[in-house]
């Protein structure tokens, strides 16, 4: 199980139950709809199903009955690779991505990981800023990693963060 950090976003109504729980197959319709609303090049239902089938860590963050966001991560030996982190558009810019990142770091440490890895679109300035705040540093660039349009590609910034116990 993944724990929530103590400092949840202050804008959240105090009467709502906020919980982070494992993502299930039954959640995928809502998750995919959120993914499509959040991104121009979203993960597909098949991507999420494959992640669940592979046993990746997949968690959803709920406030009351609403899906706030989710993350999917893969543990390999002593490293954790963040594959997807998304906050629903209605909840963006309220501190929920930071909450998910803190939860991921806590979970990764509990799994014995010594570092976190991720890729992010070179144009995703908000995400790059968030990751830098959380101690990630650029360690590489993957040219033409992401689709940008039918004819263009976009590079991925590869980032890593050591986890200190």
What are these regions (language model features)?
Residues 101, 124-127, 144-150:
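Short glycine/proline-centered loop/turn elements that form peptide/ligand docking sites
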Residues 41, 114, 152:
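Flexible coil/turn residues that form the inter-helical turn or adjacent wing/linker of helix-turn-helix
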Residues 3, 117-119, 132, 137-154:
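Conserved catalytic-core motifs of GNAT/GCN5-like acyltransferases
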Residues 91, 96, 130-132, 153-157:
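ABC family nucleotide-binding domain
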Residues 87, 121-122:
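Short amphipathic helical patch at the helix-1/turn junction of helix-turn-helix
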Residues 21, 119-121:
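Surface-exposed loop and edge beta-strand positions of immunoglobulin-like domains
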Residues 3-94, 98-107, 111, 144, ...:
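Acetyl-CoA-dependent GNAT
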């Amino acid at each position: 199980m993944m724990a929530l950090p103590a400092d949840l976003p202050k804008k959240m109504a105090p009467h709502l139950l906020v919980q982070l729980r494992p993502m299930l197959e039954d959640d995928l319709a809502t998750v995919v709809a959120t993914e499509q609303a959040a991104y121009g090049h979203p993960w597909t239902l098949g991507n999420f199903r494959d992640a669940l089938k592979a046993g990746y860590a997949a968690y959803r963050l709920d406030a009351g009955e609403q899906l706030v966001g989710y993350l999917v991560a893969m543990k390999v030996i002593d490293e954790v690779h963040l594959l997807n982190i998304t906050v629903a558009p209605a909840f963006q810019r309220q501190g929920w991505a930071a909450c998910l990142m803190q939860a991921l770091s806590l979970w990764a440490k509990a799994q014995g990981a010594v570092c976190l890895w991720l890729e992010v679109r070179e144009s995703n300035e908000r995400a790059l800023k968030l990751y830098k705040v959380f101690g990630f540093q650029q360690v590489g660039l993957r040219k033409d990693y992401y689709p940008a349009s039918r004819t263009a590609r976009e590079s991925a910034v590869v980032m890593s963060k050591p986890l200190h116990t």
